[in-house]
């Protein structure tokens, strides 16, 4: 038997030739690039020895700068200095303006309503800005490694939805990079710590970066990384600490004018410096806009206490989803520069009952994990036994009759995954079916999020329930969803890749999960009522057709009894008593049993007419 060597598409198959691959942590505040050299994963520094690259781009008519050079222009040219662009990825203009009303640069809508940033270099979208950051990181890598990159792994928050993930991939392609995989940031951290320490058991990854918070509960066992549950907030991070402290300094300094963007930037820079200093000192002196004052760690802790508490509430929900007690967690991995804040480490340690792990630089750990994964995917570790299993954050399903949601892939299912279910037609002669893809945890369509719609046409005209449509949901390793519907007898099919024009609002995911628990009993009752109403409609429609076709099989008295039963069913079906509807359906079934038997006898006689006993 011939042996086939299977390699990553687009990569050279030359044996024993080490390929150049990097992991990129594309962060809200800072970004990093890392690689594996001599068996060790390490982040790559610039010519000045700096590993972090500020996720900031400054645009001018004659060109742009990225990183530290760009950040120095933030105070003197804020309108052309773009930072925290990751928060805009996959979002609508309206959403951005509502969530971040004090941005120092001008935004306007493109033709399709997506955000464009007005700069001296022209109108730019968030994908272009992200691409410029990725180009800078790639240039650092190629200069350091002295060769072209064969592939990259880019990390994204676990809560990024399809639009945000797709936007990240588009930015990478615009930067000329071959994306091996998008990797959830907490999972990347687990790879870094899992390989270094060889831990087995349940681990919590607490990731508090500049713009997002993620909590992941993972089980590490014999090289398998399985995410048991995820949670968090896609718009909570160290940036929020900075803004709270900046507002506090503004109040203390008596600065009332919020329209002066230069002063706003100075306040923010002062807040960032103070936050960093307070990680080591109990107090720090602040000088801004002609004001000098002292900020203590206790004052800072009081400002951010509510935000830290929000992260712990998300931790509690994630543990519940994973069916794990805090006492079962062996280690807590701290990720993100904001986890250097003493109050964060203190509260997290109290919550889990153990000292968090910080042996790997929390700024670098995600990039290091991504580099390890990139090294494997590019083919440099063909004997690796590590298996990576991510999860989807919210259930995926379809709308069915009655406005119900039929879940096809439950939340926290590991990916990549493919699941299929069969559905059937509701009406006689139905030749098309509308497929409505939903996301969420509730039972009714009105309480879930619409992802996409498409139609399957060319279904054979058969009696209701005669056609069988197989709907397949496939989620790839990057969390992108492809839905295919196929009529089984003819093979006719239609499909769609879900790429929403913009993502979820900041609190929508957490709210959807919380609501599913709060309204669980109410939702079950609503679903039962909707199901009974759908069944009543099916029975009435089917019976109406039967009475039209075979009324002659009934006496006048029999017809009157059936008419009374159906009339009663119509009345109760218009009300909201599921039990009453169920009883009315049973009554109709009882009163029509003889009629159904006669119709069956008639059908058999027609089918056997003209045939001999031997033929039968």
UniProtKB/Swiss-Prot annotation:
UniProt keyword Zinc-finger, yes or no: no
Keywords: ATP-binding, Chaperone, Nucleotide-binding
Coiled-coil regions listed: none
A Gene Ontology molecular function term of the record: ATP binding
Domain of life of the native organism: Bacteria
InterPro entries to which the protein is assigned, alphabetical: ATPase_NBD, Heat_shock_70_CS, HscA_NBD, HSP70_C_sf, HSP70_peptide-bd_sf, Hsp_70_fam, ISC_FeS_clus_asmbl_HscA
Gene Ontology annotations of biological process type: iron-sulfur cluster assembly
UniProt keyword Calcium, yes or no: no
Family: Belongs to the heat shock protein 70 family.
General function of this protein: Chaperone involved in the maturation of iron-sulfur cluster-containing proteins. Has a low intrinsic ATPase activity which is markedly stimulated by HscB. Involved in the maturation of IscU.
Protein name: Chaperone protein HscA
